[in-house]
Amino acid sequence: GICDTKNRHYLPEKLLDGKTTVNENGNNSQVYPGNLKEYRAVLADDIEDVWYEYVPNSYDPEKKTPLVVSMHGGLMTGWGQAVYTSWTLVADREGFIVVFPNAASKRMWMMECDWEKVIETLGQISGDVPLLHKPENHVEDYHDVKKTVKLIEKMKEKYNIDAGRIYMQGMSMGNAMTGQFARYMGSILAGAAGSGCPTNSKLLFDNRHKVINQSGPLDIWQSRLELDKVPPHYREGDHETIRYNLEYWNLVNGCDALPQIGIRDEYNFAFYKGSQGNNVLMDVKNRDHGQTFDDAELVWDYLFSGCYKDESGRLHHSEPRKKWCVDEVNFAVAKDRRKAWVNNGIMELHIPCFFWEKIKYHGLNGNAIVRGSYAYIPVSSLAEIFHMRLKTEENGRVAYLCGAPQIG
């Protein structure tokens, strides 16, 4: 494709020409896929809906075929989600079908939310901020939820879909929509995944911190971006929201043990095996709100390709296309924390980790620029981690690590 480096639009219509691509630190696009077809029909509530189907040339109507439902972000469209992900490319390789529905109104999904906080928060924000839909009745009654169920049924009637291998993935508001669907209608899914915009924790737990769930276990993938922020009406911190979203599905899926972790370039993985289902957390370094272009491929290769449900609705696992990229040797620390992650286990540091910032202030009129940030832990803890002998001099002001380091 021809990359339009001057584009500054959220969803440029120019992408429809089948030649243009865009490249941004939140969303990267592919050329508009030739097999992507638009459809319109009344699916529920006498409302005409729009969706886009992608059927790869390798589709065999004689074979049971997996289905992926991919949900676009707020103010986007189904075709926008198709070009901003690699789902169609993975479908070409694997032979499954992908459907990209449009939200019914304002390009925004009907979502559970605390409406009073939404109104109060948006009143404090300047600029042309679109208003969420006011939720009415129960989640199962939302048109976007009902029509998605009907769309899946329609796809099963039209194609030879494997009912045990239906998956959903979404980006941003589409991630929140996917999470909502997974919690209330997830019994028809084997797995769900999303990038950006985790769910407000107040929608996940009741007042006794019991999970709110009508669907039961299913395999879950959560992609989180380092430079992302949760919506302001959540009224909770970014890390708090991410932690509770992870905790929620760990409880539902019976993931009681410590995860196995893997670090690949700017991607940090935590793999959780559960008694009822598996969870994957992918943390992306130096990434803004959105989804990485290869997010779909990673979700399929490491998770969706290895989970399915039987006719009774019970979740099962087989070997995924790629084995989990677990590091046997790993070491991680966090600011102000006394615990360190060492070789997929936890050890206690002698004092908490702290960070020191290298700054430049000369010639900046009293301001400063952070040029580097460095983690510090006790040398004695390093000696313990790497099974080395610690030698100190000058009352501890000088320390040596003696002997060859041993890993594991």
Regions flagged by a language model, labelled:
Residues 69-71, 195, 284:
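Alpha/beta-hydrolase
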Residues 38, 42-52, 64-161:
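Serine-hydrolase catalytic machinery in alpha/beta-hydrolase-like enzymes
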Residues 156-158, 163-216:
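Primarily recognizes the serine-hydrolase "nucleophile elbow" in alpha/beta-hydrolase
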Residues 190-276:
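The feature captures the conserved acid-bearing segment of alpha/beta-hydrolase catalytic domains
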Residues 1-67, 93, 140, 144, ...:
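A domain-start/cap signature at the N-terminus of enzymes
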Residues 65, 78-81, 85, 138-146, ...:
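Soluble non-cytosolic domains of exported or imported proteins
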Residues 77-80, 107-111, 178, 201-206, ...:
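Extracytoplasmic/secreted cell-surface and envelope-processing proteins
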